[in-house]
Amino acid sequence: MKTHVDVLIAGAGISGIAAAYYLQKDCPDRSFAILEARDTIGGTWSLFRYPGIRSDSDMYTFGYSFYPWQQPQAMAPGPAILEYLDGAVEEFGIADKIRFGTRVERMSFSTADSLWTVRTRDVATGRTHEYTCNFFWGCMGYYRYDAGYTPEFEGIERFEGPIVHPQLWDDDIDYADKRVIVIGSGATAVTLVPAMSDTAAHIIMLQRSPSYILSVPQDDPIDRVLKRLLGEKRSFPLIRRKHILFSTMLYQFAQRFPERAKRFYIGGVRKALGPGFDIEKHFRPSYAPWDQRLCMVPDGDLFEAIRLGKVSMVTDHIDSFTERGIALRSGEELE
């Protein structure tokens, strides 16, 4: 027997929870359900467990306008974000709308009936079920949760040590006092590397090409003053608008004056790392700022790890894996 709802939401992560809130608020007469393949809410924030997992945008804008972020850290650690999402689900009575362990397998649309038919499978039992709905709202994100993307590297099977994908991080992984190579310099890498640097013997951050990286304050003094003067609840709309304005100005500045923006970003790295570091090789991208995402690091934690000698930067192309490390096109081998 089919189950009919007006709106079917796929995914109980940050987007799916927001969709449910607005449906309840703006369309209280409409029925809906949330299908979630896993056994918990949170999506990315309950799946990813690698060291240092955090938001790479401030939570005042990344979080909900209808549920104020009240932690002091703007760029929050993963567990704090998951706690925040749990709080939103409880606050707005969304939990009873979620069908956990339910994976969407197939969808079809009937023009004659103006209905979607959605076939699902119970992850635990394998049983199938069909839903019908007038609107299907996809809030699944863009990750394949069971297997992250892994490039093909020549000779990778020869490497004798463990190879770990951050998306599939296991809490039992022991990297204490070991040399680690982290491939990439995007948002995941700039989060992972500083968090591992206090425990690992040394980390090499291997990138094919540089990224723009900006240090931002973790505990913004302006936010702190507004909270003290107005309180958490009344200050939140102002703090949110301030962060939106700051991000918009950064973007617009980069679009209108790309060369000046480039000097600003690279100048910040030069100031953080001091003289003697090859900024041009490792931190000057070939593209203009905001042609790709800007990576932000709270309180310059990545730069501090580099400055203290815990992390080395290598900019080169991978030729192949070896038994003990990675051979680069330049002829150098990293172990």
How would you name each of these model-derived features?
Residues 2-4, 8-10, 14, 18-34, ...:
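Rossmann-like dinucleotide-binding core of oxidoreductases
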Residues 72-144:
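Feature captures the FAD/FMN-dependent oxidoreductase FAD-binding
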Residues 69-87, 99, 183, 253-262, ...:
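Short beta-strand to alpha-helix junction loop
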Residues 5-9, 14-98, 207-208, 271-273, ...:
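Beta1-alpha1 glycine-rich phosphate/pyrophosphate-binding loop at the start
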Residues 100-115, 311-329:
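A conserved short coil-to-beta-strand element within the FAD-binding core of flavoproteins
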Residues 3-5, 124-135, 175-176, 330-335:
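Core beta-strand elements of the Rossmann-like FAD/NAD(P) dinucleotide-binding domain
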Residues 10, 130-143, 180-183, 318, ...:
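Short hydrophobic core segments
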